[in-house]
Curated annotation (Swiss-Prot):
Name the record gives this protein: DNA-directed RNA polymerase subunit beta
Oligomer status and interactors: The RNAP catalytic core consists of 2 alpha, 1 beta, 1 beta' and 1 omega subunit. When a sigma factor is associated with the core the holoenzyme is formed, which can initiate transcription.
GO CC terms: DNA-directed RNA polymerase complex
E.C. numbers: 2.7.7.6
Gene: rpoB
Length: 1358
């Protein structure tokens, strides 16, 4: 096995037993692939039948009302974005690019005849159609400067669905759901009548729809029921038995007798094949039936008197005595009736026709029109147009390819081509027929929660739909413009207004329910947010009406949606996470990968199956035992089939799971020993990992699952080498790689990677990248070059490994509280940097412009000490609560001054009294260091000194960066040319003869520009030098162009909102150490609040004097059933012991041979997966050992982890007792505790629920407008609620004065509180109570009822 650059430095010991079959696919592909499909920007490769291309093709051509103009779509181009991703975030801009569409305007001769079109002119040009937001490389969008994610939606797939309402007997219904257009429902009522609804409006008979389609009553009956012939004779009535075979299995309603009146088959018996043979042998072709049975029948076809043409009876009329007499009179002795006798099929259509009052197509169309447009008078043309527009015109109604595929599959017919996206007559007939079959017990209703009936709508599809909405509005505008604009030379630009497209897309990205502010606490929360699948949002469910079934885990979720990771609370089960190996197919259905089993042998061929396909197969688990030839070991195997868990013979197995972790999501796959935890706790664990705050120093988990490197790699926060090569230069801002051109398919000689430094994330955490390579290191493509935030050597590192003792300590771990050692605070283990952004905006007010200036009235010099001359805080200043960050003054309304005051003002040149101090100050409870300042202003008034200074600094930095970049390229080109040319024969060189040998000394005398002028005799060498020369020239031009573009973007004026003159952003870095009140958690849902930070000397310690870091309550484990944490602690202790063993070996010797022996014992004596230490050279072995001193990292994959014996073996090698318990001593007394304590290393996280963000106190502040009571909550600087129960508590103690104070002056007694303030200022400690405002509110509410109630101020003495 080969190891990457980062893996060589720290090899993780693997415990998985199962073979590695398939790599976890790129975790963000659901986002990136979907949007790529939408944009299909590369026209050269041929655009797909999707995305922008298909929307534009469907919307054009647009024809003017008079037919003179036609606008055709030709092609589109997506331009370059104005700013790059980083600049968009700084400027608060949207990362987008202009969409230019090539349109062709065809002008016809207006004098031509109506039926002929003579082309007069064709005009073509590119038309700007708005800006399309671009996706960043990490699958996000930057909208108005903030990073957002569009969450994929799980919605009901287009097609037809049959369901049953359990509240009513026989209430089956069918619903045809299109991708776009009106819904069509058919439903049974309790009487067996079939009703139809369009868009859930008023119901009407289903046969009305059939008549509107052009079917007559006769045709409807012919389609849905069989007919039989009754003959009338002197004896009575006889039913002709035409097709006996069709009657098999039906219940007979009469006796079948032969010519001798012998009963062959009795009444109320189900007809069998044997009975049919008996009847045929007896030669019976008709059977006598009595009139009672005949009178239940109905006529199958219109009965017409052929002589006169008079209609005796219409189809579906009841067979009555008078009707039979009329038939006999005109000589009709045979009557075709609907067969209700020999078939059990219900008479639903016949009964529905009885309710249906319409007689023909026109009446049916009018009926539908009345339902959809009640109150509108129906006109013949509009009636037909309305109905056709509902289901039969593709621009208004589309099933889409998915809907058509699902509809054809459900009805089991391919009569309709898969390219037809509107409804056909056969579809509607087929749906009603299937509904009747289901009512008759011959079919099944659909499971709506089956993933074969729900599909994923990803970001590309949603933006496509928004674009379609915008384009539809543009289309209407084009038609209007064509008829209104009278111009000689009309061009496409003159008639296209792109604003509706921009508006539709902007609305979706800024305020759409599924376009969300990215969760950016740590890399895992980013990845999880992008892989989220929501059932909420437009066109989805609402959380109030979603029932238990839709939220529940379904059998089809296996390998597609994670059964664990979902939010707690009202959204539980409605928001899910994609399973680690799942993907979305072209139709939008989720697919899971499986290994194909051929003739009992498991192959490595991978096939992806959707939930619909999977129902038909038998699938074995990933952990099923195989022999060395990949055949099943056991005869009976536990499998899944049709949503059930079954035991079956190995010969029946058709597929096998790819991996044990394929059923869980990325977050759940990070939890070691997941299989030993209760599902509820794992859900909390998976969710809490997303809330972990990245700490100052990242530390890998000692006990991991092997998924850490995958999440870190795919999150996009680590820097990954694009090409193989050698590290030429490294500093904190940049990594330069000299590319190995033989290994990499690139013409670049140099790759330069810029690192992100101290950038604010969406959750105010700090994003920072640190290089992990050194100059001279050889790297391969795909190797990690720099760690992002919460990453350690390319592995996700959300917390720290702490030594945990499961024991009580003086009640400080009561109710999940956590007792911490002071060492953790001292070592800055859980110290995190948070970057807050404070914005100050200077606006143009009615009274004049606001001004950012250091000249502020009534402010001391000390308060302005941290500001520069522009009134903006210096970078590097340490700021406390209340400090001014940006000094700003706002004009006040002018006061009427006396002449004396005006004179004094004029003498002292004092103009400050008409301005108010509205400076931006540090909020209460915060302090930190200013790390960055950004100034944005309009160019109208010229730029301020600070803005110019910042601009100059940015330009100088860019120039320096690009110069350094070019210097690196030059040195690489120089060294590569030197290697090739020294010792070569010269063709032509200044100062040397032809054929002379070029020396190093001669080259050293020449400037590099002259090197490039030398030519050589060897043609191959000349070609190589020529390539290097061209690369150098091109690089020089490219870098100059990049600098000019950068300079232009830095100096470009800022587009500020209307009325805004200047915006200043101040970024303050705040360091937060862990303290009591902060929330911590493990990975198994074991959460708690830090109760006390104890001095190291007081913590319990081991026999060798090592104090523990954390004391956890052992009572938190049995009832919660998350035993995984105990196993993690044991394995963590073993890992720590192995690290100590390596450290001791290093102290004795640094010989690689000795170290290899120790490593061999650690890595290869326990577990099935071996590590090839021979692949590492001696230097790499030493580096590895140095990195393993703190503990040997272990991977125990979910459902395939370390066994009890493995843990015991490792504990033994590490020098610990195999039960993982040890004697501890009390740090305060030095005495041992009574019993041995379970001690181990556990990975603990600090969560983003910090006490600093929650602590809050108020003295005075804002009040509610109506009740005049203080507001609530930290955000409003509110007070504490003194509620009903608190009042009872004071009443119980008889604390009348305290109670009066609480309910009046401290709450809503306006006069009382101002008097109180005055008294405090004056030093008086008295309290005057007035009427609370809440009494006035009550009085006014009572007055609204017409009762005049007032307060009696008079005292009792009077």
């Amino acid at each position: 096995m080969s190891y990457s650059y980062a893996e060589k430095k720290r090899i993780r010991k693997e415990f998985g037993v199962l073979p590695h079959i398939l790599d976890v696919p790129y975790l963000l592909s659901i986002q990136t692939e979907s949007y790529k499909k939408f944009l299909t920007a590369d026209a050269a490769k041929g655009r797909l039948h999707s995305g922008l291309e298909i929307v534009l093709k469907q919307s054009f051509p647009v024809e003017s009302k008079n037919g003179q103009y036609e606008l055709h779509y030709v092609d589109y181009q997506i331009g370059e974005p104005t700013f790059d991703e980083t600049e968009c975030q700084v400027r608060g801009a949207t990362y987008d690019a202009p969409l230019n569409v090539k349109l062709r305007l065809v002008v016809y001769n207006k004098d031509a005849l109506p039926n002929e079109k003579i082309v007069e002119d064709i005009r073509e040009e590119y038309v700007y159609m708005g800006d399309i937001p671009l996706m960043t490389t990490n699958g996000t969008f930057i909208i108005n400067g903030t990073e957002r994610v569009v969450v994929s939606q799980l919605h009901r797939s287009p097609g037809v669905f049959f369901s049953k309402d359990d509240s009513e007997e026989g209430a089956f219904s069918a619903r045809i759901i299109p991708y776009r257009g009106s819904w069509l429902d058919f439903e049974f009522d309790s009487k067996g009548i079939i009703w139809a609804r369009i868009d859930r409006k008023r119901k009407f008979c289903a046969t009305v729809i059939l008549k509107a389609l052009g079917y007559t009553q006769e045709q409807i009956l012919e389609n849905f029921s069989e007919s039989k012939t009754i003959t009338s004779n002197s004896k009575g009535f006889a039913l002709r038995l035409d097709s006996l075979s069709n009657m098999k299995g039906e219940l007979l309603k009469f006796d079948i007798v032969d010519a001798q009146d012998y009963v062959i088959v009795k009444k109320n018996k189900k007809l069998t094949s044997r009975d049919v043979k008996k009847i045929k042998d007896a030669g019976v072709d008709s059977v006598a039936i009595d009139f009672d049975l005949v009178s239940t029948l109905r006529v199958a076809k219109d009965i017409v008197n052929e002589a006169t043409g008079e209609v005796i009876a219409y189809a579906n009329d009841d067979v009555t005595e008078s009707l039979l007499e009329s038939c006999v009179e005109v000589g009709l002795l045979e009557l075709e009736v609907i067969d209700f006798i020999t078939t059990e099929r219900g008479r639903y259509i016949s009964d529905t026709l009885k309710y249906d009052l319409t007689r023909n197509t026109d009446e049916a169309l009018v009926e539908i029109y009345k339902v959809l447009r009640p109150g509108d008078p129906p006109a013949a043309a509009s009636v037909k147009a309305l109905f056709e527009g509902l289901f039969f015109i593709e621009s208004r109604y589309s099933l889409s390819d998915i809907g058509r595929m699902k509809l054809n599959a459900r009805l089991g017919s391919d009569k309709v081509s898969k390219d037809i996206y509107t409804l056909e007559n056969s579809d509607i007939v087929g749906v009603i027929e299937e509904l009747i079959n289901i009512r008759d017990g011959k079919g099944k209703v659909d499971d709506i929660d089956h993933l074969g009936n729900r599909r994923v709508r990803s970001v590309g599809e949603m933006v496509e739909n928004q674009f379609r909405i915008g384009l539809y509005r543009v289309e209407k505008g084009i038609r209007e413009s064509m008829s209104l604009v009278h111009k000689d030379k009309l061009m496409p630009k003159d008639i296209v207004n792109s604003k509706p497209i921009t508006a539709a897309i902007k609305e979706f990205f800024t305020s759409g329910a599924l376009s969300q502010f990215m969760d950016q606490d740590n890399p895992l929360s980013e990845v999880t947010h992008k892989r989220r699948i929501s059932a909420l949002g437009p066109g989805g469910l609402s959380r109030d009406r979603a029932g238990f079934e839709v939220r529940d885990v379904h059998a089809t979720h296996y390998g597609r949606l994670c059964p664990i990771e979902t939010p707690e609370g009202p959204n539980i089960g409605l928001i899910n996470s994609l399973a680690s190996y799942a993907r979305v197919n072209d139709y939008g259905f989720l697919e899971a990968p499986y290994r194909k089993v051929v003739d009992g042998k498991v192959t490595d061929e991978i096939e992806y199956l959707s939930a619909i396909d999977e129902d038909n197969y038998v699938i074995a688990q990933a952990s099923t035992k195989l022999d060395e030839n990949n055949y099943f070991v056991e005869d009976l195997i536990q499998c899944r089939s049709g949503g059930e868990a079954i035991f079956t013979e190995s010969s029946r197995v058709q597929y096998m799971d790819v991996s044990a972790k394929q059923m869980v999501s990325a977050a759940a796959a990070l939890i070691p020993f997941l299989e030993h935890d209760d599902a509820n706790r794992v859900l909390m664990g998976a969710n809490m990992q997303r809330q972990a705050v990245p700490t100052l120093k990242s530390e890998k988990p000692l006990v991991g699952t092997g998924m850490e490197k995958i999440v870190a790699r795919d999150s996009g926060n680590c820097i990954i080498a694009r090409n193989a090569g050698e590290v030429a230069e490294v500093d904190s801002n940049r990594i330069v790689i000299k590319v190995d051109t033989e290994k990499s398919q690139t013409s670049n000689l140099v790759d330069i990677y810029s690192l992100t430094k101290f950038k604010r994330s969406n959750k105010n955490t700090c994003i920072n990248q640190r290089p992990i390579v050194n100059v001279g290191d050889k790297v391969e493509a795909g190797d990690i070059l720099a760690d992002g935030f919460a990453a350690d050597f390319g592995e996700l590192s959300l917390g720290h490994n702490l030594m945990v003792a499961f024991m009580p300590w003086n009640g400080y771990n009561f109710e999940d509280s956590i007792l911490l050692s002071e060492r953790i605070v001292k070592d800055d283990k859980y110290t995190s940097i948070h970057i807050e952004e404070f914005t100050c905006v200077a606006r143009d007010t009615k009274l004049g412009p606001e001004e950012i200036t250091a000249d502020i009235p009534n402010v001391s010099e000390s308060s302005l000490a941290k500001l520069d001359e522009s009134g903006i805080v210096h970078i590097g200043a340490n700021v406390e609560a209340g400090d001014i960050l940006v000094a700003k003054i706002t004009p006040k309304a002018e006061q009427q001054l006396t002449p004396e005051e005006r004179l004094l003002r004029a003498i002292f040149n004092e103009k400050a009294s008409n301005v108010a101090d509205s400076s931006l100050r540090m909020p209460s409870g915060t302090s930190g260091t200013v790390i960055n300042v950004q100034v944005f202003e309009n160019d109208k008034g010229g730029k301020s000194k600070r803005a110019l200074k910042i601009e100059k600094e940015l330009i100088d930095k860019a120039r320096k960066d690009f110069d350094e970049e070019f210097a690196v390229i030059e040195s690489v080109v120089k060294s590569s040319i030197e290697q090739e040319v020294v010792g070569a024969k010269i063709q032509k060189a200044k100062g040397l003869k032809k054929g002379a040998i070029l020396t190093k000394e001669f080259l050293a005398t020449l400037p590099f520009s002259k090197w490039l002028e030398i030519s050589f005799e060897d043609e191959k060498l000349e070609e190589k030098v020529q390539n290097a020369r061209e690369y150098y020239e091109e690089a020089k031009i490219a870098i100059d162009a990049k600098f000019e573009a950068k300079k232009k973007s830095i100096t470009q004026s800022n587009e500020l909102s209307p009325g805004v003159l200047k915006t200043v952003k101040v970024f303050v870095a705040i360091k937060k150490r862990i303290q009591p009140g902060d929330k911590m958690a493990g990975r198994h849902g074991n959460k708690g609040v830090v109760s006390r930070v104890l001095p190291v000397e007081d913590m319990p310690y081991m026999e060798d004097g090592t104090p523990v870091d954390v004391c956890l309550n052992p009572l938190g484990i049995p009832s919660r059933m998350n035993i995984g944490q105990i196993l993690e602690a044991h394995l963590g202790l073993a890992s720590y012991g192995l690290g100590k063993k390596i450290e001791k070996t290093l102290e004795k010797t640094r010989k690689a041979a000795e170290l290899r022996k120790t490593l061999e014992e650690i890595y290869n004596s326990v577990g099935d997966k071996k590590v090839n230490l021979e692949a590492l050279n001696d230097e790499e072995i030493l580096t590895l050992c140095d990195n393993l001193k703190g503990g040997v990292p272990i991977a125990t994959p979910v459902f395939d982890g370390a066994k009890e014996e493995d843990i015991k073996s490792l504990l033994k090698i590490g020098g610990f007792a195999t039960n993982g318990q040890m004697k501890l001593f009390d740090g305060r007394t030095g005495k041992p505790f009574d019993r041995h304590v379970t001690v181990g290393y556990m990975y603990m996280l600090k969560l983003d629920h910090l006490v600093d963000d929650k602590m809050h106190a108020r003295s005075t502040g804002s009040y509610s407008l109506v009740t005049q009571q203080p507001l609530g909550g930290k955000a409003q600087f509110g007070g504490q609620r003194f509620g009903e129960m608190e009042v009872w508590a004071l009443q119980a103690y008889g604390a009348a004065y305290t109670l009066r104070e609480m309910l009046t002056v401290k709450s809503d007694d306006i006069a009382g509180r101002s008097k109180m303030y005055k008294n405090i200022v004056d030093g008086k400690l008295t309290m005057n109570v007035d009427v609370p405002e809440s009494f006035n509110v009550l009085r006014n509410e009572v007055r609204a009822l017409g009762i005049d109630m007032d307060f009696d101020y008079s005292s009792e003495e009077e």
